[in-house]
């Protein structure tokens, strides 16, 4: 029985199938953890959703920014981005069922030995705070009021966590930290603009969220996706798994038990 954690799939379904064959994934005994962004610019977002959903309890999914955007598009709140290939989802007979299933997924998934989220965990949070914050937004997403949240989540402010944040300010920060964060300023403020590799950043105050000196200690390693420019990052405390399959890079997965990394080059689409 093994736990496999995969980075951003973004509709790269064929690569996912090859990757699972490579590691001999068995849905009857193994668990696949998906670090968000199941859908978007790859050619088979619909097939990806159907497959992951079909795994039932053998799949543990967290929501990414592209997944939330898909929900916004389904509600008419946002337009499909030009490069997104998600239209088949809306045209399919099971599209609404898949979207409902997606909306039930968490922002943070936890194993006794690790946690998985899409972008990361705010450097101002300990794990207990991260759990509580994730649950606040998850309960809204699963409620009848989810449209209100999706309609109002698009904002880069506030960029600094305070325990007394409330209402939309609180929800926006939580969503941005879990699904959009890459860099932070030295004082802990989130930067929502820079997507470069850390080595190319000229702004001296910017640093990856996981390298902030004052980052709260977590008692489990964090596995995340979202940041393709890292080209994979492995340390004792964090493991970044997005290696840009949708950008002609590769799809990367790690087996937790022995830390073996599996990689599948992007196919020509």
From Swiss-Prot:
The keyword Hydrolase applies. This is Bis(5'-nucleosyl)-tetraphosphatase, symmetrical. Its EC number is 3.6.1.41. The gene is apaH. Belongs to the Ap4A hydrolase family. Hydrolyzes diadenosine 5',5'''-P1,P4-tetraphosphate to yield ADP. It comes from Vibrio vulnificus (strain YJ016). It catalyses: P(1),P(4)-bis(5'-adenosyl) tetraphosphate + H2O = 2 ADP + 2 H(+). One of its GO terms (molecular function) is bis(5'-nucleosyl)-tetraphosphatase (symmetrical) activity. InterPro entries: ApaH, Calcineurin-like_PHP_ApaH, Metallo-depent_PP-like.
């Amino acid at each position: 029985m093994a736990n496999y954690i995969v980075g951003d799939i973004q509709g790269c379904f064929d690569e996912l199938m090859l990757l699972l064959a490579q590691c001999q994934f068995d849905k009857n005994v193994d668990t696949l953890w998906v670090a968000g962004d199941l859908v978007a610019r790859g050619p088979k977002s619909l097939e990806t959703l159907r497959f992951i959903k079909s795994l039932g309890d053998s799949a543990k999914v967290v929501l990414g920014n592209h997944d939330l955007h898909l929900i916004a598009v389904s509600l008419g709140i946002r337009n499909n981005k030009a490069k997104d290939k998600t239209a088949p989802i809306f045209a399919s007979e099971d599209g609404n069922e898949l979207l409902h299933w997606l909306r039930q997924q968490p922002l943070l998934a936890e194993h006794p030995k690790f946690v998985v989220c899409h972008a990361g965990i705010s450097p101002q949070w300990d794990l207990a705070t991260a759990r509580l914050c994730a649950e606040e937004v998850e309960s809204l997403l699963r409620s009848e009021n989810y449209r209100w949240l999706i309609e109002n989540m698009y904002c880069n402010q506030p960029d600094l966590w305070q325990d007394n944040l409330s209402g939309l300010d609180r929800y926006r920060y939580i969503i941005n930290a879990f699904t959009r964060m890459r860099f932070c300023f030295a004082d802990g403020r989130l930067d929502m603009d820079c997507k470069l590799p850390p080595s190319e950043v000229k702004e001296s105050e910017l640093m990856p969220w996981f390298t902030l000196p004052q980052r709260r200690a977590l008692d489990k390693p964090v596995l995340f996706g979202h940041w393709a420019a890292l080209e994979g990052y492995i340390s004792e405390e964090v493991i970044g798994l997005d290696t840009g399959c949708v950008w002609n890079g590769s799809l990367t997965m790690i087996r937790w038990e022995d830390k073996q990394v599996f990689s599948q080059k992007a196919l020509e689409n």
